[in-house]
Amino acid sequence: MRPEDASSRWIRPREPEEAAAIAIVAYLRGYGPASVDNFHNWLSRGRVSTRQVRKWFASVGDRLREVEVGGERRYVLAEDLDELLSTKPTKAVRLLPGFDQYVLGPGTDDPHVLPAARRRAVSQQSGWIAPIVVAGGVVRGTWKIAADNVQVAWFSEAGAVPRSGLRAEVERLSTILGRDLGLAVN
């Protein structure tokens, strides 16, 4: 049965150019500032040409603003620019689950989110994405639960371990899971 025959509420799929503009705006709302490559990888992992993706970005036009992040051109929604510019860097520590959108959105190959040297620690065999420790907006380690402990593998180059922030996150996780958990840092 064809979808339009199955439901009177069926809406025809949009043309690719129209759908792309909607997707770019939604993507940048969630993950901006982001590069064309970030969006391209998130959308299709190379199934659409880079040239086509660039055309789609150009078609969004004045709704986007270019910004520089670490010497690279990124895009943000024009309406979000002032808020972005007034945002202060965070020192927050978070334990995020495997396959979290924090790394899937920009992609594990974005060095602003995940240091390149640690990509294999997060993006593992058979497509597994490990649970991550984010501190100061950057992936600083991985974690897992073993017995009654949250075992954190803190990246040595990430500096001092933020133990109080990690303890607070383990406490939060304990509440969510309904069981007491300890903290072990490697």
Give the ranges of each region predicted by the language model:
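Long, low-complexity intrinsically disordered regions
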Residues: 1-103, 108-186
